[in-house]
Design a protein with these regions (language model features):
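C-terminal accessory domains and tails appended to enzymatic cores
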Residues: 42-175
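Short alpha-helices
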Residues: 1-44, 163-166, 170
Length: 175
């Protein structure tokens, strides 16, 4: 949008401004891997990178915004990007990780899901939706944890929490 306004008024961005325009588009769409990517923005980013001699491949990697789980506690991991929802009187929470590679199933199951089960009790939640975006393979793992069990879903692309995942979760509570 900012770039479009600059074009409309005839303003030519500096190299630093062009870089910031590209970064803002990439960060918002997980380096154009997200389902909410607008293909015209990809073309604009490539054009600007070429025009201003910016390293497009470096920017793609930089803008993945990977979660530094090696420096985080389990509590920080399971609450990263946490949001709360009220779906028809049911309390639901979600959190996510953006990782280059998904950790082993033993870490996910024995450490993270175990901690999520405790978090459900502690916060009196109906459900905790834990999302892992695996950037290396362009996959999304959705883990729905309730007091009654765990349901896991795997998707062959990077989904949007707000656009793709949570609206489906909301429908679970609408019925």
């Amino acid at each position: 949008l900012i770039y479009e306004i600059m074009q409309l008024v005839g303003y030519k961005p500096s190299a630093e401004e062009a870089k910031m325009i590209i970064v803002s588009m990439m960060v918002d769409t997980t380096s154009f891997k997200s389902s909410k990517t607008i293909m015209e923005e990809v073309e604009v980013a490539k054009k600007l990178a070429y025009e201003y001699e910016l390293d497009y491949d470096y920017l793609i990697k930089y803008c993945l915004c990977l979660t530094p789980i090696d420096k985080m506690t389990v509590e920080e991991i399971i609450t990263n990007g946490q949001k709360y929802y009220d779906y028809y009187g049911y309390k639901v929470s979600s959190a996510y990780l953006q990782l280059y590679e998904k950790p082993s199933d033993s870490i996910v199951n024995d450490v993270w899901i175990k901690a999520l089960r405790e978090k459900i009790k502690e916060c009196h939640l109906e459900m905790y939706v834990f999302i892992i975006f695996e950037m290396e393979k362009d996959k999304t793992y959705e883990i729905r944890v309730t007091e009654n069990g765990v349901k896991k879903f795997e998707y062959p692309k990077i989904l949007s929490r707000g656009k793709d995942i949570m609206p489906v979760v909301e429908k679970v509570f609408a019925n």
